[in-house]
Amino acid sequence: MTRLVPALRLELTLQVRQKFLHAAVFSGLIWLAVLLPMPVSLRPVAEPYVLVGDIAIIGFFFVGGTVFFEKQERTIGAIVSTPLRFWEYLAAKLTVLLAISLFVAVVVATIVHGLGYHLLPLVAGIVLGTLLMLLVGFSSSLPFASVTDWFLAAVIPLAIMLAPPVVHYSGLWPNPVLYLIPTQGPLLLLGAAFDQVSLAPWQVGYAVVYPIVCAAGLCRAAKALFGRYVVQRSGVL
């Protein structure tokens, strides 16, 4: 814990210095520009899709961007020679970006709808969805030396995490097999936050528990990939 607090402070400083915080504010303004001109009756329909897009930007691309900034500045390899443990490093990164994503989502929803939405499913959907996208973005960026190479390969995990839930939620293909994609649950929660779907008790349990289980697995994968592509290449092992 004594190492985590300075790590959080440093991560927030880096987010400001690298302009990711500014980019998050800009993305929020873009979503407002999309939603506010819509008729009031259409805003709750569009809002879950908008928030999923925000999760993809802040969750997936921002964390990948921070990794490549650290690679460029040669700081990510130096982490292994400090007392900071991997879990503390990852927790600091996830916490700061998660807080940014949640702040943008709540502000956008409140400006667009006032208090005419359900806060609890909104927060749960954003937190769980962003956490999943952060872990996928972090893990997928580690093997690549340049952001250009990562962008080309990132299309695959991004499409897997986003396209099937959107297809299911929109009713284009409501096949139960799509529940295997962990971001399906957060999207259902976002739909419930704006009264677009009514969730059965089992769906609520699925939407909360399954993403957490998948996030735990992604954390272990992130640690393994960090050891292979960062620790070993730094010459420590």
Swiss-Prot record:
<keyword id="KW-0812">Transmembrane</keyword>
<feature type="transmembrane region" description="Helical">
    <location>
        <begin position="119"/>
        <end position="139"/>
    </location>
</feature>
<dbReference type="Pfam" id="PF24686">
    <property type="entry name" value="FLQE3_permease"/>
</dbReference>
<keyword id="KW-1133">Transmembrane helix</keyword>
<keyword id="KW-0472">Membrane</keyword>
<protein>
    <recommendedName>
        <fullName>Fluoroquinolones export permease protein Rv2687c</fullName>
    </recommendedName>
</protein>
<feature type="transmembrane region" description="Helical">
    <location>
        <begin position="20"/>
        <end position="40"/>
    </location>
</feature>
<dbReference type="GO" id="GO:0055085">
    <property type="term" value="P:transmembrane transport"/>
</dbReference>
<feature type="transmembrane region" description="Helical">
    <location>
        <begin position="199"/>
        <end position="219"/>
    </location>
</feature>
<dbReference type="InterPro" id="IPR056926">
    <property type="entry name" value="FLQE3_permease"/>
</dbReference>
<dbReference type="GO" id="GO:0005886">
    <property type="term" value="C:plasma membrane"/>
</dbReference>
<feature type="transmembrane region" description="Helical">
    <location>
        <begin position="147"/>
        <end position="167"/>
    </location>
</feature>
<dbReference type="GO" id="GO:0015562">
    <property type="term" value="F:efflux transmembrane transporter activity"/>
</dbReference>
<keyword id="KW-0046">Antibiotic resistance</keyword>
<dbReference type="GO" id="GO:0046677">
    <property type="term" value="P:response to antibiotic"/>
</dbReference>
<feature type="transmembrane region" description="Helical">
    <location>
        <begin position="96"/>
        <end position="116"/>
    </location>
</feature>
<feature type="transmembrane region" description="Helical">
    <location>
        <begin position="49"/>
        <end position="69"/>
    </location>
</feature>
<keyword id="KW-1003">Cell membrane</keyword>
<comment type="subunit">
    <text>The complex is composed of 2 ATP-binding proteins (Rv2688c) and 2 transmembrane proteins (Rv2686c and Rv2687c).</text>
</comment>
<comment type="function">
    <text>Part of the ABC transporter complex Rv2686c/Rv2687c/Rv2688c involved in fluoroquinolones export. Confers resistance to ciprofloxacin and, to a lesser extent, norfloxacin, moxifloxacin and sparfloxacin. Probably responsible for the translocation of the substrate across the membrane.</text>
</comment>
<keyword id="KW-0813">Transport</keyword>
